[in-house]
Amino acid sequence: MIARLRGVLAETSADHAVLDVGGVGYLVWCSARTLSAIGETGGDVLLFTEMQVREDAITLYGFGSAGERDSFRLLTSVQGVGGRVALAILSVLDAGELSRAVAGGDKAMIARANGVGPKLAMRIVNELKDKMGGVALGPGLGAAPAAKGGVSTDALSALANLGFRPAEASAAVGAAIEELGDGATLDAVVRLALRKAAK
């Protein structure tokens, strides 16, 4: 599996980028959010990736953060949500906004994405509520402003990678962010969240 790619940005389009890695051009499908932040052609780029292998195709999806990739994996675990639909959702909602929409049962927020109708939006909310349910329980996290979404999402990803369950990780990260306040660094949030989760 290809977990990430670092290379020179050869070209971009409305829905994908091509990275030149050691002379090989990798076509990577990305959300509009990732493409808008990827930088100029010719620059050095690091993308976290998810590779899907099917009988007729091998497809690479690229993300600006591990948190966005984790959200993509959750979305594609829902019946009826393929890679393109997941990217459409992540084009209009960042990982933190998606977590809050699921926790709050806000199907209209999810249905803003192209190709997502009310029924699919409701299925996403229902199927992901248990997997992302801890977000609603984490004090302060559900109401966190968008500016903190990146830190909270990356901290959640870090704790999940260390083996904590989503509910445990969300509660610990939420408590850490509430205690540290605005402007807390990812390192500080993760350290405090680990102490809280270990109690």
UniProtKB/Swiss-Prot annotation:
Region annotation Domain III: where it falls in the sequence: 154-199
Gene Ontology biological-process annotations: DNA recombination; DNA repair
Entry keywords, A to Z: Cytoplasm, DNA damage, DNA recombination, DNA repair, DNA-binding
Pfam families from the UniProt entry: HHH_5, RuvA_C, RuvA_N
Source organism, top-level taxon: Bacteria
Signal peptide as annotated in the record: none
GO CC annotation terms, alphabetical: cytoplasm; Holliday junction helicase complex; Holliday junction resolvase complex
Subcellular location: Cytoplasm
SMART domains tied to this protein: HhH1 (SM00278)
Domain note: Has three domains with a flexible linker between the domains II and III and assumes an 'L' shape. Domain III is highly mobile and contacts RuvB.
Function of the molecule: The RuvA-RuvB-RuvC complex processes Holliday junction (HJ) DNA during genetic recombination and DNA repair, while the RuvA-RuvB complex plays an important role in the rescue of blocked DNA replication forks via replication fork reversal (RFR). RuvA specifically binds to HJ cruciform DNA, conferring on it an open structure. The RuvB hexamer acts as an ATP-dependent pump, pulling dsDNA into and through the RuvAB complex. HJ branch migration allows RuvC to scan DNA until it finds its consensus sequence, where it cleaves and resolves the cruciform DNA.
Family: Belongs to the RuvA family.
NCBIfam families noted in UniProt: ruvA
Name of the protein: Holliday junction branch migration complex subunit RuvA
Organism listed in the record: Rhizorhabdus wittichii (strain DSM 6014 / CCUG 31198 / JCM 15750 / NBRC 105917 / EY 4224 / RW1) (Sphingomonas wittichii)
Lineage, uppermost ranks: Bacteria, Pseudomonadati, Pseudomonadota, Alphaproteobacteria, Sphingomonadales
